[in-house]
């Protein structure tokens, strides 16, 4: 009996190993025929992600508050990749504008297969006591309230049309609270919570995941205290910050069929970050 069981286990193991080997050597990252919305898609990480999705075959909707930046990015994507790219102005903290964004997307493409919640806001402030109610509300609106509404509306549509994938762009500030990013870190921690909650609420047909970037050299890096950053790079395994293109692989994996059994997770893309540090230049007290 033990010998038979052992033989059966070995046969199953070989079958699983063979299937795993096939998947490992030929993962399906092809996004041809799919439509992706990328919020905050006109610059920084969002722009890199939008280009990456288009290069993989997706048509993309580029949205941010500035339509001129959206148009420039959309034109550049179409010129390079030949994919359709729709620029749409949208402040994700305004739920009425979210409704308009989805209406324009569906009018142009008839479907939504991928949502990347990338838009973010992390303003510099002098101290916790100096944070106004208006500033706090703006940070929560862009980083948490807006993504919640977008996920709710898009996941509902996806669940009725065969499925889809959502990726939230979080931050190491969600895991490593910092004195210079309190509202932002709290909002991103909430976004991590929503990632898991939405994965369970809309699974199995809709997959919801997050990437958790560390320090990337986007336009916000101009506000960093670079001497402090250089010192604290000693707490990063890669000993450096990231380039925007280095976020693309993780996002592409999560939205593609290669991640068909991955949902409800947050993947760090942070160079091996383990020690919190404050990047913003501190104003004089």
Q: How should each PLM-predicted stretch be described?
A:
Residues 35, 42-44, 66:
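Conserved glycine-rich cofactor-binding loop
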Residues 67, 89-101, 133, 245:
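The beta1-alpha1 cofactor-binding region of Rossmann-like NAD(H)/NADP(H)-dependent oxidoreductases
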Residues 126-128, 132-140, 166, 221, ...:
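Substrate-binding pocket helix/loop in short-chain dehydrogenase/reductase
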Residues 151, 187, 195:
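Active-site helix of classical SDR
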Residues 156, 199-204, 260:
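Alpha-helical segment proximal to the catalytic Tyr-Lys
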């Amino acid at each position: 009996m033990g010998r038979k069981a052992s033989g059966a286990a070995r046969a199953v193991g070989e079958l699983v190993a063979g299937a795993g080997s096939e998947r490992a050597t030929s993962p399906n990252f092809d996004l041809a025929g799919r439509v992706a919305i990328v919020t905050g898609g006109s610059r920084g990480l969002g722009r890199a992600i939008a280009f990456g999705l288009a290069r993989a075959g997706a048509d993309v909707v580029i949205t941010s508050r500035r339509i001129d930046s959206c148009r420039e990015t959309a034109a550049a994507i179409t010129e390079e990749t030949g994919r359709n790219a729709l620029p749409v102005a949208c402040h994700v903290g305004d739920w009425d504008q979210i409704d308009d964004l989805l209406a324009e997307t569906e009018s142009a493409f008839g479907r939504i297969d991928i949502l990347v919640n990338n838009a973010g806001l992390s303003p510099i402030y002098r101290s916790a006591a100096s944070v106004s109610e208006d500033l706090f509300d703006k940070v929560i609106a862009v980083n948490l309230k807006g993504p919640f509404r977008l996920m709710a509306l898009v996941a509902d549509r996806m669940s009725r049309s065969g499925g889809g994938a959502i990726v939230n762009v979080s931050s190491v500030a969600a895991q490593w609270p910092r004195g210079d990013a309190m509202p932002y870190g709290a909002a991103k921690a909430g976004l991590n919570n929503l990632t898991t909650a939405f994965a369970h609420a809309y699974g199995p047909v809709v997959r919801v995941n997050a990437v958790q970037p560390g320090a990337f050299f986007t336009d916000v890096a101009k506000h960093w205290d670079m001497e402090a950053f250089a010192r604290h790079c000693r707490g990063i395994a890669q000993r450096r910050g990231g380039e925007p293109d280095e976020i693309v692989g993780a996002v592409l994996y999560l939205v593609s069929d290669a991640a068909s059994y991955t949902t409800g997770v947050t993947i760090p893309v942070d160079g091996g970050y383990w020690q919190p540090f404050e990047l913003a230049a501190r104003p004089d007290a």
